[in-house]
Regions:
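A short beta-alpha structural unit
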Residues: 208-217, 229-235, 261-280, 306
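Alpha-helical metal-binding/catalytic segments enriched in His/Glu/Asp
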Residues: 21-24, 30-70, 159-165, 171-197, ...
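Acidic, glycine-rich active-site loops and adjacent beta-strand->loop/helix elements
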Residues: 5, 25-27, 61-72, 138, ...
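Midchain, well-structured core segments that form catalytic/ion-binding scaffolds
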Residues: 68-69, 75-237
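Short beta-alpha connecting loops at secondary-structure transitions
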Residues: 91, 233-236, 267-269, 324-335
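Zn-dependent metallopeptidase/amidohydrolase metal-coordination segment
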Residues: 22-23, 293-344
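Acidic/His- and Gly-rich active-site-bordering loop/insert found
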Residues: 1-32, 50
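Flexible, glycine/charged-enriched surface loops at secondary-structure junctions
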Residues: 56-57, 118-122, 174, 196-209, ...
């Protein structure tokens, strides 16, 4: 109904919950060609090998390609998995708009899908046994430390908070500094504080401002509005909230100092996820059988698995990103590392589906 793509290797007992694997097929603007696609094509390749070898699982295996994981169109990430797990409704997507003012509902419909059928696509409890996602690491640790495989012990939660500042537009040359109500000044001070707020909390939390919108965005006028999005992530839910609260406090402080109005709105969130011990043990066992150099590690990025964890036990496999680069054209993962990741995915899928 919304652009998620599925394929199934039918098992010998179709009454059993399915085992699912896959990732997303979209990217960010000016992004790379490995993020998401390694896990999507990796799942397809793992199932292709099963078919080639004549293996039929007991549990059916579903390959899934999730739509709109990055949030590039609507600044709402992981839409495909949110819709699959009932976290977004038809009414919600009628309200979500992109920069051109097109709603998610209309874009889905114009692409030939039926968004009104979304409720029928929501995964029913007990119908998915596990979701296993292969992904590039998107960080420098595996590449620098030399491990081929990361077996994920937990997935970071995320909050996106949208901060809007409203001032008074006026002439850049004729308006004295002491008479200005400049939202850009307030925004710059808030953004400068965010780095220190995150660093003071712990070593795992991260906070990023990667999107900013200024109106009217011309060089010879004081802006009347600034909107920016703060991306806060950590493997502990309570520290995410602490960071958000402190950002709200400095927003209020600098808005008042610069005599501008402000709003702070949470526009996206996902809970931190703990990977269940039994599935980690299966993956460790299979990694050792394959003689892979692996390490247990947390994931700092949010993935579709965060939302799939609402309906099933999830697990993730990471392969190294060269120089830690991701969401850039230079994004690259060595093909031998991808093969190792797909081998572990294949063995894990076989182990939990028989």
């Amino acid at each position: 109904a919304v652009g998620n793509v599925f394929a199934r290797l039918v098992g010998t007992d179709e009454s059993l919950p399915v085992v699912m694997s896959g990732s997303h097929i979209d990217s960010v603007k000016n992004g790379g060609r490995f993020d998401g696609l390694v896990g999507s094509i990796g799942a397809l390749e793992a199932v292709r090998v099963m078919v080639e070898e004549g293996y039929q699982p007991k549990n059916s295996i579903d390959i899934v390609f999730f739509a709109e994981e990055e949030g590039s169109n609507f600044q709402v990430p992981v839409m495909g998995s949110k819709l699959l797990t009932g976290k977004l409704t038809v009414d919600d997507i009628k309200e979500i708009k992109n920069e051109a003012g097109i709603t998610a509902y209309d874009m889905i419909k114009n692409a030939g899908y039926d968004p009104d059928n979304m409720p029928n696509d929501v995964i029913a409890p007990g119908t998915v046994k596990n979701m296993i996602e292969l992904h590039i690491e998107q960080s420098v640790r595996r590449d620098k430390e030399g491990h081929t495989i990361g077996i994920i012990s937990g997935i970071a939660g995320l909050n996106w908070i949208t901060i809007t500042l409203e001032g008074v537009q006026n002439h850049a040359g004729a308006t004295p500094m002491f008479l200005r109500q400049d939202p850009m000044v307030a925004a710059s001070k808030i953004i400068a504080e965010i780095d220190g707020i995150a660093k003071a909390i712990n070593d795992t939390i991260v906070a990023t401002v990667g999107y900013i919108e200024v109106t009217p965005n011309i060089p010879n006028a004081i802006p009347n509005g600034v909107k920016f999005v703060v991306d806060v992530r950590d493997i502990q839910q309570e520290t995410i909230q602490q960071c958000v609260d402190e950002i709200k406090a400095v927003t209020e402080k600098y808005a008042k100092e610069n005599d501008v109005k402000f709003t702070v709105e949470k526009t996206a969130s996902s809970e931190a996820i703990k990977i269940q011990d039994y599935i980690k043990e299966v993956m460790v066992e299979q990694a050792e059988k394959l003689d892979l150099d692996y390490v247990l590690m947390p994931s700092g990025a949010v993935h579709d698995s965060n939302y799939m964890a609402e309906v099933t036990d999830v697990a993730m496999i990471f392969v190294p990103s060269v120089d830690g680069r991701s969401h850039v054209n230079e994004e690259y993962t060595d093909w031998d590392d991808i093969k190792a990741g797909v081998d572990l995915l294949l063995n894990t899928l076989v182990a939990i589906s028989q």
